[in-house]
Design a protein with these regions (language model features):
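Papain-like cysteine protease catalytic cores
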Residues: 1-120
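Deubiquitinase catalytic domains
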Residues: 70, 74-195
């Protein structure tokens, strides 16, 4: 469920990864100058080790990072707030052995109620919001988005035993996923490569 997924994301977040997500924009979105920050709690990070301790600008910047990191975690914990997919895109797509070892290509197909043609849009964050572009070597996770709700698209195969495929790949070729491979190569990959 959503609560468990958010708790898992919080448990794997590190300040060193956080500074890179969304091209560093999460710091700008979530820091608060009013926060009281004790950097001593965060001395065992790669980011801290790159600081010049005598440089006041470095210390101020590191306090912004810590503030943003803590506020982002509080944001994720709040079940009343809507979490825009752009905040989570890099967390989900970046390789992380505790989440998705190879990372993912996240493909969100949006259904709009105001489109009389029943078209489905492909949602893709701009380079401003992500470090992750489509990579054919990563597995692809498909989601359907309608309003603020997301549902995964899985493939189910029945044979000697039921098998559920949660991600798809251009490189795993089998008769059972040939249609998905064609969609990835002919529609999804060219769309993402245009951006």
């Amino acid at each position: 469920n959503i609560k468990d997924f958010k708790e898992h994301i919080i448990s794997i977040l590190t300040i060193d990864d956080f500074v890179n997500y969304n091209n560093g924009n999460l710091i700008r979105y979530f820091y608060d100058l009013e926060d009281e920050i004790d950097i001593n709690e965060y001395k065992n990070t790669r980011t801290y080790k790159t600081l010049k301790i005598n440089n006041e600008e470095d210390i101020i910047y590191y306090k912004k990072i810590i503030s943003a990191f803590n506020n982002f975690i509080e944001f994720l914990k709040d079940d009343e707030l809507f979490i825009d997919y752009t905040y989570l895109w890099d967390i989900i797509c970046t390789p992380n052995p505790k989440l998705f070892a190879k990372g993912l290509n996240l493909i969100i197909m949006e259904i709009s109620d105001d489109d009389i043609t029943n078209n489905i849009g492909i949602v893709c964050p701009t380079n401003y919001h992500t470090n992750n572009i489509y990579n054919a070597r990563k597995p692809c996770l498909f989601l359907i988005k309608k309003d603020d709700y997301y549902e995964p698209i899985y493939s189910r195969f029945e044979g000697n035993k039921i098998s559920i495929m949660k991600t798809f790949s251009e490189y795993k070729v089998s008769s059972s996923n040939q249609e998905m491979k064609n969609i990835l190569q002919k529609i999804i990959k060219p769309y993402f490569n245009k951006l």
